[in-house]
Amino acid sequence: MFLQTALLLLSLGVAEPDCNTKTATGPYILDRYKPKPVTVSKKLYSATRYTTSAQNELLTAGYRTAWVAYCYNGGLVDSNTGCNARLLHYPPSRDELLLWGSSHQCSYGDICHDCWGSDSYACLGQLDPAKHWAPRKELVRRDANWKFAYHMCNIDWRCGVTTSPVFFNLQWVKNEVKVSTLLPNGSTVEHSAGEPLFWTEKDFSYLVKDNFEIQREEVKISCFVDPDYWVGERKTKKAFCQDGTNFFEVTSHQFCHQYACYNFSKDELLEAVYKERAHEKSKDLPFGNKSWTVVTASIDDLHALSAAQAFELEGLRASFAELDSRFRQLSEILDTVISSIAKIDERLIGRLIKAPVSSRFISEDKFLLHQCVDSVANNTNCVGDSAYVDGRWTHVGDNHPCTTVVDEPIGIDIYNFSALWYPSAAEVDFRGTVQSEDGWSFVVKSKDALIQTMMYTKNGGKGTSLTDLLDYPSGWLKGQLGGLLYGNIGVYLLIAFAFVLLIRLIKSAGLC
């Protein structure tokens, strides 16, 4: 026994002839890598979801306006000469708008062009706005009077109607989910689902109808919550969630995103997010109280967003390069460990490459592989004449009996890793802006048409052409000249009297 121990110590001493065991430094321990703590967490949160079966409501928009110009031509000396011209708004009533929408036509009143004398009384009476029908009509502005010493009346109408689907949002209003109709100016109008909404604005009338109900269901919403979310130099708390193809940021336990509203159950982590975001009111938002659906991005905005994404991308590239470098270091360390252990466990390399081979090292880093018996049975330690005992394959014998495993082995997880989240592509619906919808673009174009009409006066206004001058009625020139001549005869008499008086004064003074 003593001889065996001496030989073992001698062999150990010979194995490391270049190591000085008489001097040492330390002690040391293997230090572990301490990554930056990750505060973001992913969790399923319970919520009550309110949704609708449709994504559009039906908008009917109609307008009606009358142009009334009551003029008198009494010449320059008559202070009553001039025109009283105005636009009168006659928005259709609710019943009228329903009829307009179903017939795709609008109604308007009588037209009066250059009505003079007793016919000019049409401008003084009550106008009947529903006597004629047309798919659409634009007025012509007239405010001239070519009849001296007479009144003249000009009445014309404009009207139009459209019916088209428009999108909407759902919104919490006093703990109740309402339908929020989005208007082109950025404001919203809330109403209950299934209840038509009617309102007027100057010469326009609007009717919004929907045929859906708000459905309620209990769901699980997947959210990433980060209590240490950095925005530049400012730290805040954020919660980003996904519900199917919808992605949104949650700022309160009652939250809405387009066609869905959520009432989240109480959660300590989410409550901290709500408290942090409570001070961010609508006045602090970039666009105030306006709906974000009316705001469009400029080229500069897109360039700024692209630059921010490029910066983040470069940061990711640098992080991946660092990870790749660390992985290479780990691979080198692991190769060294495997090489060292494989000199003791000759089957290690075979198990790693999934081949029935054993290794035999012939130098520090070079080895040979030997073919071995392939283990095909997984419920016994014996294969043919070989038995697996104490981590080694040996011959079956009295000292190495075969053992059969009857019970299914129980797995032991020594890592306790949680499952990774794998992102998946989702189709996001883009709605565009409110102004781009057919119904609201009709309203905008109609208002622009009225502005252009008011800039152009028939017979002598903006854009006058030879054809326009020839459109003057017969007698117009005579009326203008007559008004100029007869309406100013008093002026001419005064000038003649002053001239005669001046001559008499000169003669009496002996100057001529």
Curated annotation (Swiss-Prot):
**What are the transmembrane regions?**
479-502
Compartment annotation: Virion membrane
A GO cellular component annotation in the UniProt record: viral envelope
The UniProt keywords, alphabetically, are:
Glycoprotein, Membrane, Signal, Transmembrane, Transmembrane helix, Virion
GO terms for biological process, alphabetical: symbiont-mediated perturbation of host process
Q: Which residues form a coiled coil?
A: none
List the glycosylation sites: 185, 263, 289, 378, 416
Q: Which InterPro entries match?
A: Baculovirus_Gp64 (IPR004955)
Could you say which residues form the signal peptide?
1-15
A Pfam family found in this protein is: Baculo_gp64
Q: What does this protein do?
A: Attaches the virus to host cellular receptor and later induces fusion of virion with host membrane.
Q: What is this protein called?
A: Envelope glycoprotein
Which organism is this entry from? Thogoto virus (isolate SiAr 126) (Tho)
